[in-house]
Curated annotation (Swiss-Prot):
UniProt name for this protein: Ubiquitin-like-specific protease 2
Any single biological process term in GO: proteolysis
Superkingdom as given in the UniProt entry: Eukaryota
Disordered: annotated span: 1-42, 71-110, 388-419, 731-800, 841-960, 983-1034
Organism (species): Saccharomyces cerevisiae (strain ATCC 204508 / S288c)
Gene Ontology terms: cellular component: chromatin; nucleus
Example GO molecular function: deSUMOylase activity
InterPro entries listed in its UniProt record: Papain-like_cys_pep_sf, Peptidase_C48_C
Length: 1034
């Protein structure tokens, strides 16, 4: 034998006995080096030699017939291209002479390289011969330690939800077989996946593989908590599982799984249970049967499956978009729920197929046969909240978080208002009267106390009380001083913005006795659109100090050391996290005006800064008031620290800021905030009751409470009755005479909502109206309204009794038709439409047909009448007015006369009227404009036009006295002259007579003094011309 050593690692054994080099060992020196005249070996050959060296020196295994049969089955499941793959295929041991000092040399094809085999197969396995191999096992019979690396996809099944969680790819499985036991570990990014080490003998109960060598499922004996890193956002989650799944994506890895399968079948077939199925779908079905054995399913189990199926469908919506990758069997890797309603649960390892067998027993969902009562259905204690539903968590929670986790449902219970039980408000009597140390007192009634139940809106009384209560508590603890803080009422901001023209004037009286710029903190609760938020104004005292020491600051600035003006900070906090820049602008305007008025400080708007401060967000739309109370309480527990937290929140990230704010403001304790506030009030009430009993005032206070509650109930019933009040108008017609009496009740004052453009037509002809300037205009000119200051008094509803006389030119049938067509001015056609179509003027007498043919309508724009006050001096009352009214009552109507009756007051009706009065006043009703015309006597038709002027001048003295007395009486009795009645004969030409008495005269119902009419004044210059009387709206 040659003295040269054999190289077993990378070179073939050399036959030095038969070679030429053996005869002349020294001849190698004369030969040229081979590196210059030979080619380098092919890398594949080098790799083949390197891999074959380990295999050749392994001992040959001897196995029984059963093991041989299983290996034959496993070899036959590969395609025909693998037929030459077998160990020792195409080679024989007889080709080489065995050496006593070395194992037998074994040749194998290139296809079998790099498979990491841990054992050597005998050449007689294929023919099933029991003859042992030529080379037996090594004396010690041990197996050399070997490691095998597989690249693929790792998944596991959650034991609770039966969901498959796929680890982020790629993962590496390291299979190791040593002298102890076979085991494997999983790696990701060169680090071991937590708790993924598995010992096959100790931990594994069953291993299932497919014949394609692309899929392997390992069922563990016990649960293991495995840390999975998911595809979405690299989020990690710990999963309790006993099913591990390994799949491959490349053909190269399949042969390594095949090697593991062979090793398990031949070496550990008795200690490890191994099953080989045809394809992956059968493995999945096998896993389903292992988890849920086939049995008669109860209705409750079917219902649970139905719920899980629904959740699985929504869970699939939350997954990241599917990524498809092709492999040998062209199956896309799709992550889906494990136990879904699809025939093949794991689409990540199989092809997409159409659902063809939904009617199978394992896929059908049976309807529970048990009857459920409505009370049990709607009043279950275990009802899950809306927040726990998968759809509700699409944006709010971790996508892969278990939605059926009871801890998760409890954590979000604050968002579920629908399932909260109704709270019965406790009776809070007597009302709490609490007086603080600064002298201010607050009262909390039973109605206020109810606001703290059932997530009701907190009213102003509760908010004002508790903000004051917690500020006083901080003062008592010496956290702040009383002179450093000022609390505004919750109505301050509402009053501030009541008139946008001048904000400061709206609340000037509220702050006259305050010194706001000496306060360090000014708290202003704000309510806008039924939402509470608050702001705290700081640094006002620094502004005042700066301007008071302005001379010193100027001296410092002259030495080239500048001192900037301090800034006023308005710290605004809203539990809905809204910004309120516009709402804070009125407060800025108020501070500027207040500083100028109170301290003569010119404050610029740029010196006032609003800062939005983060606070915990409210979970509903009703707890804003509670959050304002708690935020103010937390602020005054440590104002400096709270301001620092708000300053630092601008620097931190948004996520970190939310966690820091929620922790600082104790958001978790706000679920019981209403209960704590109620408890505080009950304790204060107990102290108050003990004080009342000590002073012997308890019984008296309770009686007052009962009386007050009784009055409130009565008022509520009264208000309910008032809601059904209707305006009813009655029209009484008399067939005996041609007179109609209308009774209506207009509202007490004209509504501001009535448009000023509304006009009521009045049909007059040649009517004469006196203007305030003394001029007389006809009806074809626009009358000038007399202006007078309006009074602020509001008159109660007044009952108007209006007499409408028959027109001398309208027949009885026509008058009746007009009365039937009459409707109220508030609900239909105005009453003036039903008046006489023509009133004879003073210019020329006309006949019936002429009067009817010459009628025309004149629009009188007087929606808001006003009185005329003629003079400052009120004349003395004359007896002419009294005799005029009484005489009108007793006079009988004459066929040739027209009776004109003025209804003033009840006193006028009782006093009587002088029948010798030469003239009577013609009054034309202006209805809803309340403008009355008091005309002079209507002349005889036979007289000429120029006689009218002479008669008017001759009666100036007598008529002037009458009008002066009317002026005084109208001012004293506060009456309105509303209507004019004309009594006309049925035949002949109309004329006036001072001595005639009309039995047909209709009197107007008197206005009572209790109606408290606004004053009327008469504009008079002693003339007998018509006078304009106007009523002023209250």
């Amino acid at each position: 034998m040659s003295a040269r050593k054999r190289k077993f690692n990378s070179l073939k054994p050399l036959d030095t006995l038969n070679s030429s080099r053996a005869s002349s060992p020294r001849s190698s020196a004369s030969l040229p080096p081979k590196r210059y005249n030979t080619f380098r070996k092919d890398p594949k050959i080098v790799d083949h030699l390197n891999n074959a060296s380990t295999k050749d020196f392994l001992p040959v295994l001897s196995m029984n017939s059963e093991s041989k049969r299983q290996i034959e089955l496993s070899d036959n499941d590969v395609d025909n291209n693998d037929e030459g793959e077998g160990v020792n295929s195409g080679c024989s041991d007889q080709d080489f002479e065995p050496l006593q000092s070395s194992p037998l040399k074994r040749h194998s094809s290139l296809k079998s390289t790099s498979n990491g085999l841990l054992f050597q197969m005998s050449n007689n396995l294929g023919n099933g011969s029991p003859e042992p191999a030529v080379a037996s096992t090594s004396p010690n019979g041990s197996i050399i330690s070997t490691k095998l690396n597989l690249n693929g996809q790792f998944s596991c099944v959650d034991s609770k939800t039966l969901r498959i969680y796929r680890h982020k790819a790629p993962c590496i499985m390291t299979f190791v077989s040593d002298h102890n036991h076979p085991k494997f570990s999983l790696y990701f990014q060169q680090s071991v996946i937590y708790n993924s080490q598995v010992n096959l003998l100790d931990d594994v109960e069953l291993i299932i593989l497919d014949k394609k060598n692309s899929f392997m499922a390992i069922i563990l004996k016990d649960l293991k908590k495995v840390k999975m890193i998911l595809d979405v956002n690299n989020s990690s989650i710990n999963i309790n599982t006993n099913i591990l799944i390994w799949s491959t994506a490349s053909s190269a890895s399949n042969k390594k799984i095949k090697s593991i399968k062979r090793f398990l079948l031949m070496s550990y077939s008795s200690s490890i249970k191994v099953e080989i199925l045809d394809h992956k779908e059968q493995i999945l079905e096998r896993l389903k049967h292992l988890i849920h054995p086939i049995s008669s399913s109860s209705p409750s189990l079917n219902m649970e499956r139905a719920i899980n199926s629904t959740k699985n469908a929504f869970d699939s919506l939350r997954l990241k978009k599917t990524k498809l990758s092709t492999n040998d069997d062209e199956s896309p890797q799709i992550h889906t729920h494990f136990l879904s309603n699809k025939p093949h649960g794991l689409q990540s390892l199989t092809k997409r197929t159409r659902i063809a067998s939904l009617g199978k027993k394992e896929h059908s969902i049976s309807v529970p046969k048990s009857n459920i009562s409505p009370s049990d259905f709607y009043n279950t204690n275990g009802t899950e909240t809306l927040q726990s539903h998968a759809v509700s968590q699409l944006r709010r929670s971790n996508r892969f978080k278990d939605v059926s986790d009871p801890a998760n449902s409890n954590s979000n219970s604050e968002f579920d208002d629908a399932t909260t039980e109704f709270e019965t408000p406790e009776l809070f009597k007597p009302s709490l009267c609490y007086k603080f140390n600064d002298g201010s007192s607050y009262t909390i009634t039973n109605q206020d106390f109810k606001c703290l139940f059932n997530k009701d809106w907190v009213n102003d009384s509760i908010l004002d009380f508790f903000t004051k209560f917690y500020i006083e508590s901080s003062i008592e603890k010496s956290i702040i001083k009383r002179e450093q803080v000022h609390l505004m009422s919750s109505f301050f901001y509402t009053k501030l913005i009541s008139n946008p023209a001048d904000y400061y004037s709206n609340v000037k009286k509220w702050v006259n006795n305050t010194d706001l710029f000496s306060k360090k903190y000014v708290v202003i609760p704000i309510n806008i659109s039924y939402h509470w938020f608050s702001c705290i104004i700081t640094n006002l005292d620094a502004i005042l100090d700066f301007h008071q020491n302005k001379d010193k600051n100027d001296a410092i600035n002259s030495d080239e050391i500048s001192i900037n003006n301090p800034l006023v900070n308005i710290l605004t906090f809203d539990s809905l996290r809204q910004t309120h820049s516009r709402e804070i602008d009125p407060i800025k305007e108020f501070l500027i005006s207040y500083a100028l008025d109170k301290y003569s400080i010119q404050l610029d708007k740029t010196q006032i800064k609003m800062k939005t401060c983060p606070v915990p967000q409210q979970p509903n739309m009703s707890d804003c008031g509670v959050h304002v109370i708690l935020n103010i309480r937390k602020f005054f527990e440590n104002p400096v620290e709270t301001i620092d937290v708000w300053k630092n929140s601008k620097i931190k990230s948004k996520h970190f800021t939310a966690k820091m704010i929620n922790k600082y403001f104790d958001k978790n304790e706000r679920n019981s905030a209403r209960k704590n506030l109620r408890h505080t009030l009950k304790l204060l009430q107990l102290n108050y009751i003990s004080y009342l009993k000590k002073e012997n005032l308890y019984e008296e206070v309770m009686q007052m409470e009962e009386k007050k509650s009784t009055n409130i109930n009565n008022n509520e019933n009264y208000d309910d009755d008032d809601e059904e009040i209707q305006i009813i108008e009655n029209i009484d017609q008399s067939s005996k005479d041609n007179n109609a009496q209308l009774t209506s009740e207009p509202p007490c004052s004209r509504s501001s909502s009535i448009s000023t453009t509304e006009r009521e037509p009045t049909e007059l002809h040649n009517s004469v109206v006196r203007q305030p300037t003394g001029e007389i205009i006809t009806d074809n000119e626009d009358p000038v309204r007399a202006a007078s200051p309006e009074t602020a008094s509001v008159s109660p509803p007044i009952r108007h009794n209006i007499l409408k006389s028959s027109s001398p030119f309208i027949s009885e049938s026509a008058n009746e038709t007009e009365q039937e067509e009459f409707t109220s001015p508030y609900f239909g056609r105005p009453s003036l439409k039903t008046r006489a179509k023509q009133f004879e003027g003073v210019s020329s007498p006309i006949k019936n047909d002429q009067a009817l043919s010459s009628t025309h309508d004149i629009m009188m724009p007087s929606p808001k009448p006003k009185r005329i006050y003629p003079s400052k001096k009120i004349p003395q009352l004359s007896s002419h007015v009294q005799s005029l009214s009484t005489d009108s009552m007793e006079r009988q109507s004459s066929p040739n006369n027209t009776n004109i009756v003025i209804s003033d007051t009840e006193q006028d009706s009782r006093l009587g009227v002088n029948s010798e009065s030469k003239n009577t006043s013609g009054i034309v009703n202006r209805d809803d404009s309340d403008v009355n015309l008091i005309g002079s006597s209507l002349p005889n038709v036979a007289e000429k036009n120029h006689d009218n002027t002479q008669e008017s001048n001759g009666n100036n003295d007598s008529l002037g006295k009458i009008l002066q007395n009317v002026d005084k009486e109208l001012n004293e009795k506060l009456v309105d002259i509303d209507d004019v009645a004309f009594s006309s004969p049925t035949r002949g030409i109309p004329r006036t007579s001072a001595t005639s008495k009309g039995s047909n005269a209709q009197l107007l119902s008197n206005y009572g003094d209790e109606n408290n009419q606004s004053q009327d004044s008469v504009w008079d210059e002693g003339r007998d011309n018509p006078i304009l009387l106007e009523d002023e709206d209250p």
